[in-house]
């Protein structure tokens, strides 16, 4: 009998699929669960086997996610609008591991639980087939055109126990938590406080607290004076920033497939790290470097959002981002206060900021030299306007 490898989270969608694939496609099911955040791997494995999976594979990939994926996003100041790409960034890692496990176990089918309305179906399928075009991808929710109500009814009819996980649909990893469904889909209503688990809404926060982040070659290397690996810094900052109201993103999002959606995210650590990194870049890189980098950063972010992590152009951009971050070393001090990140100090051995030159109280910079610069700088614009005005009068 053929086998299908199911990317299994333990939630409603993928729990229903274990039975559905066996029943509708006459395949044995092997599940793959990746811990990218807070997954209880043993509990999920036990559940998959009870549902009829012939094997349940679990992998803890949090450190790999931080070191090989999040690190590249930090270099690239990865944002899609306001969104730090937390879910989008995890999908290529999941696809990579799924292809590897499928090849090791001679499995020719990979199934995922994404709907036909979202971005993840694209991210999974492009990534999987970019890595191995011989693997066939199965998308039961899309192919069966299932709604959440359909899934619940199927689970009930087949005695599939699904733990109630509240009124919201949640996806989380160490870089962020996305919240969908329920009242969030009504854009004329405020998001209820019960949607948030990582971030205390700003109105309930205290007097704030300072944080200090040191960067080495564009990546965080210490937090509040303590050296840590990137994963540990992210874990600690999720707690510190979250209790100070940092990281709630509430936005109208333009999905890859052409739909508008109301998206709510909690990304406390990501918000702080990306803000601090950008402050440091602005201190160290010159105007031309920043201009080029801003363009590449935006292009990089759109590629990740659109599921093109394994496109060859990404490798070229990653090389540029690594090169442009080689001097992004220094420290950034922020005060986290009721949802705000206030810069309280920044320094770097590569800083281009010259206090003696910019200070209005000193005479280091000869202000008179600006006159000659302006005369040359304005020439093209002034001449263009003069010529056009003269021609307008003639006609």
UniProtKB/Swiss-Prot annotation:
Annotated residues for binding of ATP: 7-15, 113
Record bears the keyword Cell wall biogenesis/degradation: no
GO function term, MF aspect, one: ATP binding
Coarse class of the protein's main subcellular location: cytoplasm
One matching Pfam family: Arginosuc_synth
Annotated metabolic or biological route of this protein: Amino-acid biosynthesis; L-arginine biosynthesis; L-arginine from L-ornithine and carbamoyl phosphate: step 2/3
Reaction it catalyzes: L-citrulline + L-aspartate + ATP = 2-(N(omega)-L-arginino)succinate + AMP + diphosphate + H(+)
Protein name per UniProt: Argininosuccinate synthase
Source organism (scientific name): Picrophilus torridus (strain ATCC 700027 / DSM 9790 / JCM 10055 / NBRC 100828 / KAW 2/3)
Gene, per the UniProt record: argG
């Amino acid at each position: 009998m053929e086998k299908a490898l199911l990317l299994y989270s333990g939630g409603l969608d993928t729990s229903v699929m274990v039975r559905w694939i066996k029943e509708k496609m006459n395949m044995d099911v092997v599940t793959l669960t990746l811990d990218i955040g807070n997954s209880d791997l043993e509990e999920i494995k036990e559940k998959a086997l009870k549902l009829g999976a012939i094997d349940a594979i679990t992998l803890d990939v949090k450190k790999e996610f931080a070191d090989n994926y999040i690190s590249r996003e930090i270099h690239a100041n990865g944002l899609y609008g306001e969104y730090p790409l937390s879910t989008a960034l995890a999908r290529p890692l999941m696809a990579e591991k799924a292809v590897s496990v499928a090849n090791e176990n001679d499995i020719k089918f990979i199934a995922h639980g994404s709907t036909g309305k979202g971005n993840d179906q694209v991210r999974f399928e492009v990534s999987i087939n970019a890595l191995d075009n011989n693997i066939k991808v199965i998308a039961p929710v899309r192919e069966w055109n299932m709604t959440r109500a359909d899934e619940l009814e199927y689970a009930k009819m087949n005695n599939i126990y699904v733990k109630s996980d509240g009124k919201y649909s949640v996806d989380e990893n160490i870089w962020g938590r996305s919240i969908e469904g329920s009242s969030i889909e009504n854009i004329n209503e405020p998001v209820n406080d019960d949607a948030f688990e990582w971030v205390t809404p700003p109105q309930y926060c205290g007097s704030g607290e300072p944080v200090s982040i040191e960067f080495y070659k564009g990546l965080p290397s210490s937090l509040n004076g303590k050296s840590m690996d990137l994963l540990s810094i992210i874990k600690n900052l999720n707690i510190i920033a979250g209790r100070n109201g940092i990281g709630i993103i509430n936005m109208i999002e333009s999905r890859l497939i052409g739909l508008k959606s109301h998206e709510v995210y909690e990304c406390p650590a990501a918000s702080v790290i990306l803000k601090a990194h950008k402050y440091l870049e602005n201190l160290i890189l010159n105007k031309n470097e920043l201009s080029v980098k801003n363009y590449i950063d935006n292009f990089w972010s759109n590629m990740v959002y659109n599921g093109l992590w394994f496109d060859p152009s990404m490798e070229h951009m990653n090389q540029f981002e690594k090169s442009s971050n080689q001097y992004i070393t220094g420290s950034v001090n922020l005060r986290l206060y009721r949802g705000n990140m206030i810069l309280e100090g920044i320094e770097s051995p590569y800083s281009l900021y010259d206090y003696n030159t910019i200070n209005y109280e000193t005479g280091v910079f000869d202000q008179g030299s600006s006159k000659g610069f302006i005369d040359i700088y304005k020439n093209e614009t002034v001449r263009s306007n003069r010529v056009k005005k003269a021609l307008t009068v003639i006609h």
